[in-house]
Regions:
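An extended, acidic, His-containing surface patch that forms the Zn2+-binding/catalytic region
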Residues: 1-99
Length: 99
């Protein structure tokens, strides 16, 4: 698969950042993660960036033996997803203009 990158100044990325900050009660940091999914193709087809709400930590060993996830972080991720709907609705005009 090709690399996929979402610009941090895109309105959808800013909305995700605000949603995560609201759920976790503090500012969040951007990270880059590797993967082998179809994200680049999906972003190209939709003509929009993809935004992931990551709620795992390195010690969770995702897709490795003894994989785990902290329930408290998983629930905060669900809370962030709920905030994200409001944030995206608030910037709907900006999202349309960014396409």
């Amino acid at each position: 698969t090709r690399p996929c990158f979402s610009p941090v100044d895109h309105p959808a990325v800013a909305a995700a950042r605000r949603a995560m900050s609201a759920a976790f009660g503090q500012d969040v940091l951007f990270t880059r993660e590797g993967g082998s999914g179809p994200e680049a193709d999906l972003a190209a087809i939709l003509g929009a960036p993809l935004v992931f709400l990551g709620v795992t930590v390195d010690s969770d060993r995702i897709h490795a033996p003894n994989e785990r996830v902290e329930m408290a972080l998983l629930l905060k991720g669900a809370e962030a997803a709920a905030y994200l709907w409001d944030e995206l609705a608030a910037v709907a005009d900006d999202l349309a203009a960014a396409r």
